[in-house]
């Protein structure tokens, strides 16, 4: 379909473009920015006056829950929710049942994602078989089946020698490894950041060193092996400082934070609401400020939803017996726009951290508005507001922001030039 988007404020962080202009789309691609090509006649037009057109958002951490946990979410339901949040490309972590450690599981996920057609899906393969941290998964076969990177989630390698061998092997084939750096022994049994709030509530704590000790080890191993590395879900100011030091000495590492870590702190736990039970945990205001500064400076180049949908029962037990995670991909753009509203980031910088930054971190063909490139576009109204939860597409309603009025409304999400969400 030939489509013209007329009169939008077009922001493309990767090229620095920020102007009111038109976008013309044909055969899944952007064929022109500005004037239409000679002979181009649009079959469909979108009047985008007053709207911002940006690269479709790229989310590096969206649990789709299939296969194995379809009571929490399905590939169809969670990609539909992602499209509503402005997302056109997403990565799904390997913690499925069975684990994403064989090409058969990768192919199943990709087939169901294509069938749903809501967003592009890029699987992250397991670094070790069954995520047990003991035996290396078949990384090359997984890459050939469509996995774009490899990680072990929060299931850490207990044996550093085994991890080192895995990194050496990944480096040989130029594969990207995703680290969720958390020391198993220091974090074990913890439910909240080890500090005043946890003490007051009587909750077992997870010290900041659970992150920083593991992160220091992982950075040294990355330096030794030369593997391409991305650090995911950082939570502490000292953690991002370690990333900044590594980058300053020339280590090519990238990092992301969960959006909710830029908004919430451990003070949210004060009434024991399980909606704020997340792993790794919410930390202090000083940590949140450190994360915000790292996002602003570009030390952290990606913001992800870290979307973890759950069925209602998973959050109904006493705090310690509930399952951690927030369902948030559906609100990715409006929730992120609170950072602009609060003066923490300007709009082009925010969009860079939600599109070009994550795409570059994992070398994904996404995150840009370029002639000849895929027509993956989000159109949003920055002056309107979204009441979170008025419509809800994710199977997981475990979201503490439901009922809040958030800045901006996603009007259209286009994947390969096809409208996958409209509001």
Predicted regions and their residues:
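Alpha-helix-loop-beta-strand connector modules within alpha/beta enzyme cores
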Residues: 103-120, 168-179, 331
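Active-site metal-binding motif and surrounding structural segment of the metallo-beta-lactamase
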Residues: 37-53
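Histidine/acidic residue-rich metal-binding segments in metalloenzymes
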Residues: 134-303
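His/Asp/Glu-enriched, well-ordered alpha-helical/loop segment
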Residues: 200-228, 275, 296-297, 301-303, ...
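Metal-associated gating/positioning segment near the N- to mid-region
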Residues: 49-116
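Divalent metal-coordination and catalytic microenvironments
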Residues: 8, 23, 28, 50, ...
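C-terminal cap of metal-dependent C-N hydrolases
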Residues: 318, 374-423
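N-terminal metal-binding scaffold of metallo-dependent hydrolase/deaminase domains
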Residues: 1-40
């Amino acid at each position: 379909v030939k489509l013209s988007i007329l009169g939008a404020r077009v922001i493309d962080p990767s090229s620095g473009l920020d102007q009111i202009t038109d976008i013309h789309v044909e055969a899944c691609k952007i064929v022109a920015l500005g004037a239409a090509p000679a002979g181009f006649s649009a079959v469909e037009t979108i009047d985008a006056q007053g709207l911002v057109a940006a690269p479709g958002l790229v989310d590096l951490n969206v649990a789709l829950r299939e296969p194995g946990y379809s009571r929490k979410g399905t590939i169809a339901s969670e990609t539909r929710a992602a499209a509503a949040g402005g997302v056109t490309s997403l990565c799904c972590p390997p913690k499925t049942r069975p684990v994403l450690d064989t090409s058969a599981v990768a192919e199943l996920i990709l087939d169901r994602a294509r069938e749903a057609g809501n967003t592009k899906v890029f699987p992250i393969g397991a670094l070790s078989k069954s995520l047990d941290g003991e035996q290396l998964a078949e990384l090359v076969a997984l890459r050939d089946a469509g996995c774009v990177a490899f990680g072990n989630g929060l299931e850490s390698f207990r044996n550093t020698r085994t991890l080192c061998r895995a990194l050496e092997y990944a480096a040989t084939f130029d594969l990207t490894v995703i680290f969720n750096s958390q020391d198993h022994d220091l974090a074990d049994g913890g439910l909240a950041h080890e500090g005043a709030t946890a003490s007051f509530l009587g909750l077992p704590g997870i010290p900041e060193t659970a992150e920083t000790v593991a992160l220091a080890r992982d950075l040294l191993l990355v330096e030794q092996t030369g593997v391409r590395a991305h650090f995911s879900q950082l939570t502490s100011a000292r953690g991002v400082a370690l990333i900044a030091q590594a980058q300053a000495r020339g280590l090519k590492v990238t990092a992301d934070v969960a959006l909710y870590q830029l908004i919430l702190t451990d003070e949210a736990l004060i009434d024991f609401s399980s909606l704020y039970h997340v792993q790794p945990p919410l930390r202090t205001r000083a940590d949140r400020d450190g994360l915000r500064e790292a996002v602003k400076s570009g030390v952290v180049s990606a913001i992800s939803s870290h979307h973890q949908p759950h069925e209602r029962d998973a959050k109904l037990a006493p705090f310690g017996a509930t399952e951690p995670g927030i369902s948030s991909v559906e609100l990715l753009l409006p929730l992120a726009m609170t950072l602009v509203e609060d003066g923490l980031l300007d709009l082009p910088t925010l969009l860079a951290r939600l599109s070009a930054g994550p795409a570059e971190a994992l070398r994904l063909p996404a995150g840009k508005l370029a002639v000849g490139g895929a027509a993956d576009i989000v159109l949003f109204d920055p002056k309107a507001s979204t009441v979170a939860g008025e419509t809800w597409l994710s199977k997981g309603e475990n979201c503490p922001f439901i009922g809040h009025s958030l800045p901006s409304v996603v009007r259209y999400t286009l994947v390969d030039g096809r409208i996958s969400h409209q509001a």
